[in-house]
Amino acid sequence: MATNLTSLKPPFKVKARYGWSGQTKGDLGFLEGDIMEVTRIAGSWFYGKLLRNKKCSGYFPHNFVILLEERLNSSTENGRQPSKIVESFEKSNKVVIPPVPSRYSDERPRPKKKLSSSMPNSPKKPVDSLTKARKAKSKEMVNEKNIYNTQSSRHHNNSAPNLPLASHSKPQVRNFEESMNNPLPPLPPLPDLDNMRKTDKRAPKKSYSANDLHMARSSREYNYYKDNQKFYDGFIPEKRYSLEEDSISSGLFSNSQYLNDSACSSENSFALMSDFSATSAGSFARHKYAQSFSDSLQRSQNANGCSTKINDSQEFGDSNASSRNGKMGDILRKIIIPKRNTNIYSSSVSSPKSPKAYPKLPDIQNLNLSATPDEARDWIAVKCHLNRARTLTKYDKHPRYMRALEENRDLILHPQDSIYNGLNTNEVKGNTKPGLVDVELAELNIEYIDKMTWKRCIRDGTMTLDSWAQTTFSARYSTVLEKLRGIYIFCTEMFALTDDNGTSDFSAEPQNLEKILYRKHCTPYELTWLFKKLANSLGITCEIVIGFLKTPSAINWEFKYNHCWLRILVNKEWRFIDVILGNVTNPIHEFVNNRKIKKAENSYFLMAPLEMIYTHIPPREFEQHIVPSIDQLSALYLPLVFPSFFKNELKLYKFSTALSFLEDSEIYECSLEIPNDVEVFASVVIPTDNEEASSAYRNMELALTQIKKQKAESGRRIALIKAVLPPNVNKGSLYIHSGVRGTQTSIANIHPLSMMVPLTHKGSNMKYEFVIKIPSESIQKIELYIVEPQSRYLFVGNEYSFEVIQSPSDGIVYSSDEGPNQNRKQPMAIKSPSGRVHELVKSDPHFPYGTWKGSIKIKEPGVWSALVIADSGIGWSVFAEWLCV
């Protein structure tokens, strides 16, 4: 028996016929047999809460539940009903779940022809014909028994969906039997996620722009599916311009075409290794050195030039004229899109039906931030720049996570979790514990072994490879570690790498290795095999691994064969050696260190598996030598790191790959955990062949690194890194350098490259730069975190609130008994271009550290500087600069 939804008056209780997990965040999932109290009806959907847990509430489809009715004198039917239900289960082999209804109400017609034609795997019988057949059959069954004629005619309505009742009636048993025998209908359209997000009463997003209007969004979604029709099995939705017609079919997520395109074995033929030589020896030759070194050097040379900063202010206005459609902050969001109730009907009544009903907005096209002083004073421009660099909260990050996952289903949001969870360890044999090799390496006299290797490695060309290895490395090398070190120095310092130009046969052992032994140059593949043969001659277990090496300026989340390295069993512990990257002639060292090296890179000698997995991805999981093994996708999405990342004991603290896919006015943000004696600097490098554009990018402050807090558990510091791409730039890279604290005294990077993060951007963007942080030798005892303003540009005629947090560099606050000099008070101030000093006021004058604040009316264009008393207590030191335009 069925009832019309329009005749129901909430609240009432329903019981779940099937279990349902929900589709969106606002849905209510339940188990079979759960009882819910319905408080609202929205079309074919109910809104209610679970009676067993009233904290859980949300939307759920009406045809997954049955209405609970209190009936009297139904004990006779209750005794007969279970047997018939059991019979119906015996007649059918499987339970057919009813289709999930559309979230649209019946008053809103939706186009279905385009949707059904775009579904490749749609059933032959449409949904409408199924529903008509079911209605016809139900009518026949109602006519068979006159008992139910009255109730059927009372509740029958063709325009509204029907709800099954929990009454023990014979026609209902027949309907249940037939519903189980019917084929599974096609999945309904997915809910309108954009509309659901608008009704979600959470913290607002960071900033919004005119692109948030429905017309621009629908056009953007149409272009997105059109460009990615191969991923979505050719699905291209209709180009819609109204919110009511916006719908997405779950049929577009068919796996057929996607699996055909992506199905490939990790053990492919070695013919795929056509670019092996490019990453082994010659790929970094064209880079010479990381561009972040030269960019930072040029910025430091131009830091004192006033003309450069005036030109920057002019370029700032020009770039804003070309990209005026950036996000304007939360205030526009509140004006353009009013708050709506979660009820669909109430929101449709309260919301304006046309754009004319909204309050009149300022013309966004006239938002030229610095063309004239009058426009620069505009409060929208000021708020936009102040709020853009605001630190992201979990509510800001979550929509970006969901958007990235929608665009790439294979994306791993937090790949570092598989390494830092404490479960994965380096593989060892027997009952030994991992890490004993590191202890032996610390006690190894490396300088003595390296000098002895240079003296003993005499290649006269008279002995075979095995006899030469046993003669050279057996007498004076007492342990396995010393023998491996000797072979490593021989291969990395006494051979020059040559490019094979793709001629190496990686499926077989290189020929004439004994002749190569007495030469001074070889290809990367030959050098790897030479190390293996020498180690095997000394009885050391050593095997070659051919896999994928992550490289700069490449797509590193797609596996391909391009590199080879060695896995070695030493003292019952598996370690890795890469003689190609450790070789002194490899151009990668000049790229990372900004100079050539004369000694072999020690980081690639007996590298731990948990460190090797960042850059070297083997095709088979057992070759990782990590217990338990790490998923290959997680390893591919780990950031590209270099030896100084592990030398300086850096660690990913809050890192997400989804945040690197920028849209409109978004910024990138990540956090690193660093020791107290290490400093970190970052810069953004834009690849371009245009010299004028490259010079302009060098002078821009596109990254900001600050020490945010001290981690209480470990005593280590948290470095917060933010980055942004300039206007009209789609791709760039974030370069992170690290080194000993206090050694870098200018903006020019002197520390080696530690980490690279690729950044992409789409949509509109306004020019934005971060405040210039200036390192100084005289400020080493305290850490200064600029809360606001973090933007580089200030606008004349506006009042700004300056806020700086001062904390001890070692994280220790001494008591008064330990001496007053331990907690020296270091006041701060803001200096105007004319030389006037505005002192900042401390929030808690009795506490040695804390927050310093001050509100200043900006009236002078030029460079504004942040000052702090030096550690010696004599004189001011500049630690930050802003540019007023």
From Swiss-Prot:
The keyword Methyltransferase does not apply. The modification Phosphothreonine is found at T391. It is found in: Cytoplasm; Bud neck. GO terms for biological process: mitotic cytokinetic process; mitotic division septum assembly; secondary cell septum biogenesis. Residues 97-209, 300-325, 815-835 are annotated as: Disordered. Residues 9-70 form the SH3 domain. GO terms for molecular function: enzyme regulator activity. Keywords: Cell cycle, Cell division, Cytoplasm, Phosphoprotein, SH3 domain. The modification Phosphoserine is found at S209, S292, S313, S354. Its main location: cytoplasm. GO terms for cellular component: cellular bud neck; cellular bud neck contractile ring; cytoplasm; HICS complex; membrane; mitotic actomyosin contractile ring; nucleus. The keyword Cell cycle applies. Belongs to the CYK3 family. Interacts with INN1. Present with 377 molecules/cell in log phase SD medium. PANTHER family: CYTOKINESIS PROTEIN 3. Involved in cytokinesis by recruiting INN1 to the bud neck. Cooperates with INN1 to stimulate the synthesis of the primary septum (PS) by CHS2. This is Cytokinesis protein 3.
